[in-house]
Design a protein with these regions (language model features):
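N-terminal alpha-helical interaction blocks
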Residues: 1-48
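Feature targets compositionally biased, intrinsically disordered low-complexity regions
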Residues: 3, 12, 54, 59-61, ...
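Polar low-complexity intrinsically disordered regions enriched in Ser/Thr and small residues
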Residues: 7, 16, 58, 63-65, ...
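Compositionally biased, low-structure terminal segments
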Residues: 19, 24, 62, 68-71, ...
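Generic alpha-helix signal with a bias toward terminal, lower-confidence helices
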Residues: 21, 30, 53-55, 79, ...
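N-terminal juxtadomain amphipathic helix
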Residues: 37-87
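Short, positively charged, Gly/Tyr-enriched micro-motifs
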Residues: 67-124
Length: 124
């Protein structure tokens, strides 16, 4: 529903693996900040099971992770990401490995990869 517009705001490739489920614009709770409004975008992982997981059953979603992304139209942007959990035929729980397909955050940060690299260049 929101994906056409969201494709302009989200990191490249995100919509291949996640769907936008909601968004919200909320006032920033902090004072003395650059942005007085926050744009929250909620993403749920799509069914991206590889063939070796075809016998698994969806077990809902794991805990939500939040990442900061580029500000959009003078609004701090926060991505809320929920990854799927799968129950395998042997009863174990597993998630689809996305690390080689898409990097949601820059290692050691809570920033999207592109935003972290931008900040690193801006800071010298």
């Amino acid at each position: 529903m929101y994906e056409g517009l969201a494709s302009y705001f989200l990191p490249t490739g995100v919509l291949k693996y996640f769907e936008v489920t909601d968004f919200a614009e909320v006032p920033t709770l902090e004072t003395e900040v650059l942005y007085t409004t926050e744009l929250h975008i909620y993403l749920d992982e799509r069914d991206n099971r590889p063939p070796d997981m075809s016998g698994s059953v969806s077990d809902g979603f794991g805990d939500e992770s939040c990442f900061l992304d580029f500000p959009a139209r003078d609004k701090k942007t926060v991505l809320h990401v929920r990854r799927r959990r799968w129950t395998m035929p042997d009863g174990t729980t597993k998630s689809v490995g996305l690390d080689k397909k898409i990097q949601l955050k820059h290692p050691g940060t809570r920033y999207s990869k592109d935003f972290a690299l931008f900040l690193k260049k801006a800071d010298g």
